[in-house]
Amino acid sequence: MSRRNAAVKRPVLPDPQFNSRLASMMISRLMKHGKKSTAQRILSDAFSLISERTGGNAVELFETAVKNATPLVEVRARRVGGATYQVPMEVRQERGTAMALRWLVTFSRARNGKSMSQKLAGELMDAANETGSSVKKREDTHKMAEANKAFAHYRY
């Protein structure tokens, strides 16, 4: 590990189109090979699809979807005397949001659909309705933490 000072965390600026920090973070997660304009187009197309289907505000639905997919606890491997325990730990809000966005993108890519914007719109709507793969992943993470509650005293 580096002996230098920890790097200063740069603030995430809100996306100019949607005026949302979460949207800006999502664009960064969607981006492949530095193609930011493509990622922005995918997100804006997904938001317009959501607005058409629901008739509501797509940005609010997106924020609800991220909130529903955000885990509160996770398990982390901890080695104690030759045995590895899955130790449940609380997730900081920043990390939880990052995990939720990562899961939303991963499960959107895994969906069957025509375009990425359609797949993303479907996953976001499912997550907002507390269904969908990303919310299931959060529930599985919480179940794992609950099952390993006995090892909570190994927290670091």
Curated annotation (Swiss-Prot):
Q: Which InterPro entries match?
A: Ribosomal_uS7 (IPR000235), Ribosomal_uS7_bac/org-type (IPR005717), Ribosomal_uS7_CS (IPR020606), Ribosomal_uS7_dom (IPR023798), Ribosomal_uS7_dom_sf (IPR036823)
* Record-annotated membrane-spanning stretches: none
The record's keywords, sorted A to Z, are: Ribonucleoprotein, Ribosomal protein, RNA-binding, rRNA-binding, tRNA-binding
Keyword rRNA-binding found: yes
UniProt keyword Membrane, yes or no? no
Q: Which PROSITE patterns match?
A: RIBOSOMAL_S7 (PS00052)
Q: Which GO terms describe its molecular function?
A: rRNA binding; structural constituent of ribosome; tRNA binding
Q: Which GO terms describe its cellular component?
A: small ribosomal subunit
- A biological process from GO: translation
Known role: One of the primary rRNA binding proteins, it binds directly to 16S rRNA where it nucleates assembly of the head domain of the 30S subunit. Is located at the subunit interface close to the decoding center, probably blocks exit of the E-site tRNA.
Q: Which family, according to UniProt?
A: Belongs to the universal ribosomal protein uS7 family.
By its UniProt entry, which PANTHER family does this protein fall under? RIBOSOMAL PROTEIN S7 (PTHR11205)
Subunit composition and interactions: Part of the 30S ribosomal subunit. Contacts proteins S9 and S11.
Write down what this protein is called: Small ribosomal subunit protein uS7
Which gene codes for it? Answer: rpsG
